[in-house]
Amino acid sequence: MSVITRIHARQIMDSRGNPTVEVDVHTESSFGRAAVPSGASTGVHEAVELRDKDKSVFLGKGVLKAVENVNTLINDALLGMDVTEQEAIDAKLIELDGTPNKSKLGANAILGVSLACAKAGAEYSALPLYRYIGGTTAKTLPVPMMNVLNGGAHADNTVDFQEFMIMPIGFERYSDALRCGAEVFHSLKSLLHDRGLSTAVGDEGGFAPNVESNEQAIELVIEAIGMAGYKAGAPTDRGGLGDGHVMIALDPASSEFYDAEKKKYVFKKSSGRELSSEEMASYWADWASRYPIISIEDGMAEDDWEGWKMLTDKIGGRVQLVGDDLFVTNSKRLAEGIEKGVGNSILIKVNQIGTLTETLQAIELAKRNGYTSVISHRSGETEDTTIAQIAVATNAGQIKTGSMSRSDRMAKYNELLRIEEELGSTALYPGIGAFRV
């Protein structure tokens, strides 16, 4: 039977040592479990993560209220529903919450239930989750965005921009791309060590050395690519630009250094320089011409629509411009962006919107309008590998799930290796084809 018989949540710990929600969903013949991630730099338009705010327990970060909501209100409402009716389950969760941002029950409570139901449905159907969600066409392994060097809110250093990532695009198999990423990661570690820079890793497994400038940060990554025996740049089949194996992706997380009162981007961790929206867009255009950059996420602040339009007009034809804080996995905000012609890609974080159905709707809306989708982790993760399954299920072609260290990050990469093995000769690795620029 596929009828839900019990839903139970508990408080567990995430990769940063903070509490998060884990949910078990039972039917008479299947079981699903999901753990919920949490972000450090969060967009103001995200669905609400419910925390207890009792400073005497876990410094206010407990999630027992969210757990209680699952074990009482949600459990009672969903008992007897068919676990394979995902859209009906998610609609019921949204109705039960009744707020536009899931602030009553908590997006962390709702998401845990939504994903656990999907897993129980997949088990009942005797299918892997990617096949259960995506059907027989689900066979594309994603190109990894590997966060190898950190700054901004993710590091205590003098780098303004949050993430410097490598994307191994010049390969025919996911497993070969993963090997490349690992070799570049270890080469970067050696490079930093030899220069007396820190090789400690941050929340997402990337290094956070105290380098002299933002430029030095990206140049270190490019040097490490060469040191590992690879070439930074595009492959030959992309406009005849060369025989590159690896390109650079950035997540400056510009909302974090945008001063809304001044309407300026303030490089407060490095030079103190202040740039207008137009100057910031020109800054990224300059970087895109100087460095082998294929993707920039949140290059402008989340509510700087004019700045986003300037940036898109300048480099949107040759660089993937990903909206994270801008779109927050929300179809309404994505539709607004499409109408205004800003960005050309959306970052997909399941906990920004709170249900699997709404997540899939955002991906579908992006696809219909020629925007790419990047399936993403959060800085606070667990051993849960659902996002790897979603990446393949939707043929998204790209995944952002950290560096080549920390088990919470490697769990997702390893799950993709298993899926590649399972798919055998039908598995596709898109490489540069994952991009529409």
From Swiss-Prot:
The keyword Secreted applies. It is found in: Cytoplasm; Secreted; Cell surface. It comes from the Bacteria. Its EC number is 4.2.1.11. Its cofactor is Mg(2+). The active site is at E204, K349. GO terms for molecular function: magnesium ion binding; phosphopyruvate hydratase activity. InterPro entries: Enolase (IPR000941), Enolase-like_C_sf (IPR036849), Enolase-like_N (IPR029017), Enolase_C (IPR020810), Enolase_CS (IPR020809), Enolase_N (IPR020811). Pathway: Carbohydrate degradation; glycolysis; pyruvate from D-glyceraldehyde 3-phosphate: step 4/5. One of its GO terms (cellular component) is extracellular region. Catalyzes the reversible conversion of 2-phosphoglycerate (2-PG) into phosphoenolpyruvate (PEP). It is essential for the degradation of carbohydrates via glycolysis. This is Enolase 2. It comes from Chlorobaculum tepidum (strain ATCC 49652 / DSM 12025 / NBRC 103806 / TLS). The gene is eno2.
